[in-house]
Amino acid sequence: MSKHLVLLPGWGLGVVPLQILAEQLDAALPQLTVQIQPLPDVRGKSAEALIALLDQQLPSDCWLMGWSLGGMLATALAAYRQSACAGLISYASNPCFVARDTWLAAMPVDTFTAFRQLCAEDLAAGLKRFVLLCSQGAAQPRPLSRQLLATAEAGDSVCALAGLDLLAELDNRAAISAFAGPQLHLLAEQDALVPSLALSSMRELNAQATVELFGQSHAGLIVESQLLAQRIADFILRGQHA
């Protein structure tokens, strides 16, 4: 039985947004060690190399939970590890972050290209735009966006752009289909970055995976952290006793 739950953060915002969720998961799952794993330095590394690096860094047979880009990396790592992964949970994480001809329920290419260009020209302005999008759909978006911006950790522009390129590159459709362990994928109903319309297509990738709507915004794991912690705990406890 796994003794660890690892949380992977999203692009640009660092580990702080996951801290409250981690504390609540600690309380809900006292039998597990909950740790937040910062994303690795993505500069100059392929997606395959990053997955291999995370495989070396993280405990074997742990539960993996990731937010947005962290969820995409967790999904790829779960498929890489297979039976050496206890289970997978993602929040606001699309199999393809950027739309493709065969995956339209994602961010349009033109929108992503314009955002990447903004970050290349003025990273601070790009982060401000990003936190506004993360907060869109929340009951109180302005305080939430200020909270996110205050602790954002995008690194330098080279690192930030490399992270965006990774978001555009990753395609986890095959990973979701191939991973045989427990999977819970949660999409926010009014997410401005990962459209909830992806839900039905995600369900078609793996009939054994659980794909649900949870929360309202891309940053819903902050404002609804207690409910999310309980949903995750219920899923893990069922998986451990299956």
Report each predicted region and the residues it spans.
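Conserved HGGG/HGGXW glycine-rich cap/lid loop of the alpha/beta-hydrolase fold
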Residues: 1-47
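The conserved beta1-alpha1 loop
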Residues: 8-11, 67, 187-188
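Gly/Ala-rich beta-loop-alpha elbow adjacent to hydrolase catalytic centers
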Residues: 66-70, 74
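Flexible "cap/lid" loop of the alpha/beta hydrolase fold
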Residues: 85-118, 159-162
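Conserved alpha/beta-hydrolase catalytic His-Asp/Glu region
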Residues: 121-170, 175
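Short beta-strand/loop motif that positions the catalytic acidic residue
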Residues: 179, 185-187, 191
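Conserved alpha/beta-hydrolase "acid-adjacent" motif
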Residues: 192-198
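Catalytic histidine-centered segment of alpha/beta-hydrolase-like enzymes
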Residues: 216-229
